[in-house]
Regions:
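Histidine-centered catalytic micro-motifs
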Residues: 86-97
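N-terminal, motif-rich segments that launch catalysis or mediate targeting to/interaction with membranes
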Residues: 1-85, 99-210
């Protein structure tokens, strides 16, 4: 109820892309590095934990925790609430936990159903759009096929969530060559995509309910 009031006539779903929309406004340029954390492939969990919170790698993991603390201190900060909603989603997008040498997949060019794109855009947009469903239809499908499982939130969970995304990222990089066969790629990764979206939704609910 408190969140509904803060977002006025809007909803969590409607505001979830606000963090991307503001990228076109130079006023918000300082937030550009908040959307990702770049980590090399093949690191151990111990190495990952030491790297994930370094802002020099991109500030995504660090800033999720930062925004949670800020909103506890000032629960009425609508801008930070909208940023938090978006960044928790980014935390569950595989290529936002990508490798620095290819800018999270942005410089890996691929062909997708005959059109040129890149690995980052594939996982941000194209793979979802290839389902041929509206966002409402897709959300309804996920709601019907996956149980809501929000957890009692603990701030230590943030790095655990990031590590889970990193595991998916490793699989995505290992299968880059398979993108040329678009339908086969969808078949292989659809369940991975679904699980990532559901994890993100459950974890966002945990944060917002805290």
């Amino acid at each position: 109820k408190k969140i509904t009031t803060l977002l006025s006539s809007s909803t969590v779903a409607m505001e979830s892309n606000w963090g991307d929309f503001i990228k076109s406004d130079d006023t918000y340029a300082e937030y550009s590095a908040w959307h990702y954390t770049n980590i090399e492939g093949g690191v151990t969990r111990q190495q990952f934990d030491s790297l994930a919170l370094l802002q020099s790698r991109g500030a995504l993991v660090y800033r999720v925790g930062y925004l949670i603390d800020e909103l506890k201190a000032n629960p009425n900060d609508t801008m930070k609430l909208k940023l938090l909603i978006h960044l928790v989603e980014d935390l569950h997008c595989p290529m936002h936990m990508g490798r620095p040498e290819n800018r999270g997949g942005n410089s890996i060019k691929i062909r997708w159903f005959g059109k040129e794109t890149n690995l980052h855009a594939l996982w941000d947009e194209a793979l979802i759009e290839s389902q041929g469903l509206s966002y409402t239809e897709y959300a309804d499908y996920l709601h019907r096929t996956h149980a809501a499982k929000p957890l009692l939130f603990d701030k230590k969970m943030i790095v655990d969530w990031a590590w889970g995304t990193y595991q998916v990222t490793e699989r995505v990089y290992a299968a880059t060559d398979k993108t040329v066969k678009s339908y086969n790629y969808i078949y292989e990764f659809k369940s991975v995509l679904d699980e990532s979206l559901v994890r993100g939704a459950n974890h966002l609910a945990s944060v917002l309910n805290d």
